[in-house]
């Protein structure tokens, strides 16, 4: 499956020929290299391993250095992904943004913005209690343990807690523009994560 590691630059808007304004997210790609292969005989399935963004030399361990010995002029990478069903590439080859030329829709995976510790209303969209005078609670969670049966709170019950900082995928984002010179891709709508965060862009599954 087609895929690249990119950086979310931010959002802007462009005008179509008919005058309609389209909100877009700009995703910029640093060079993505094939750094390895997985085979059916050795790993049980076939896939390509792609990497992007050089890792700081202080963070490169000896085992990681050994993995890159056979690759000339390619430094150890910070971000690594697996691409299944993508043929025609060998170790050391670069995957460029033009692979999305024939693609109309993409899935984008990123890490959502961290919001810190939040209450149930913000975190889970609960309605809360009555706002009127005399109510004992306004933004509280309410009961979590039912009555005599089961007389306990089940694991996984929605409560207040840390919000954000999770991996999230937005599917079927329309590809609006590809700029090969600037290694940029413009997709319609919003993408998970803050400006400058790294995302994985893949051809849409659906």
From Swiss-Prot:
- Matching Pfam families: Ribosomal_L3
Subunit organization: Part of the 50S ribosomal subunit. Forms a cluster with proteins L14 and L19.
Q: Which domain of life is it from?
A: Bacteria
Which NCBIfam families does the record match to this protein?
L3_bact
Q: Which Gene3D superfamilies match?
A: Translation factors
> What family does the Swiss-Prot or TrEMBL record give for this protein?
Belongs to the universal ribosomal protein uL3 family.
UniProt region (Disordered), positions on chain? 127-151
Keyword match Secreted: no
Function statement: One of the primary rRNA binding proteins, it binds directly near the 3'-end of the 23S rRNA, where it nucleates assembly of the 50S subunit.
One GO cellular component this record assigns the protein to is:
cytosolic large ribosomal subunit
> Which BP terms does GO give this entry?
translation
Q: What is this protein called?
A: Large ribosomal subunit protein uL3
Entry's PANTHER family?
50S RIBOSOMAL PROTEIN L3, LARGE RIBOSOMAL SUBUNIT PROTEIN UL3C
**Organism listed in the record:** Borreliella burgdorferi (strain ZS7) (Borrelia burgdorferi)
One MF term in the entry's GO annotations: structural constituent of ribosome
Signal keyword on record: no
Q: Which UniProt keywords apply?
A: Ribonucleoprotein, Ribosomal protein, RNA-binding, rRNA-binding
Stretches that traverse the bilayer = none
């Amino acid at each position: 499956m087609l895929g690249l590691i990119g950086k979310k630059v931010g959002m802007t808007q462009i005008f179509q020929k008919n005058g309609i304004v389209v909100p877009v997210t700009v995703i910029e790609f640093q060079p993505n290299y094939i750094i390895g292969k997985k085979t059916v005989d050795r790993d049980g399935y076939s896939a390509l391993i792609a990497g992007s963004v050089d890792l700081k030399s202080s963070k490169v361990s000896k085992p990681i250095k050994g993995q890159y010995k056979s690759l000339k002029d390619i430094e150890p990478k910070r971000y690594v992904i697996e691409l299944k069903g993508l043929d025609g590439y060998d170790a050391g080859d670069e995957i460029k943004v033009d692979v999305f030329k024939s693609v109309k829709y993409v899935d984008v995976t990123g890490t959502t913005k961290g919001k810190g510790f939040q209450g149930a209303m913000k975190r889970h969209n609960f309605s809360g209690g009555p706002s009127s005078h005399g109510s004992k609670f306004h933004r509280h969670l309410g009961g979590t343990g039912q009555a005599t049966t089961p007389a306990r709170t089940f694991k996984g019950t929605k409560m207040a807690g840390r919000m954000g900082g999770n991996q999230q995928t937005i599917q079927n984002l329309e590809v609006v523009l590809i700029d090969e010179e600037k290694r940029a891709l413009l997709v319609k709508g919003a993408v998970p994560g803050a400006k400058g965060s790294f995302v994985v862009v893949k051809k849409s599954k659906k």
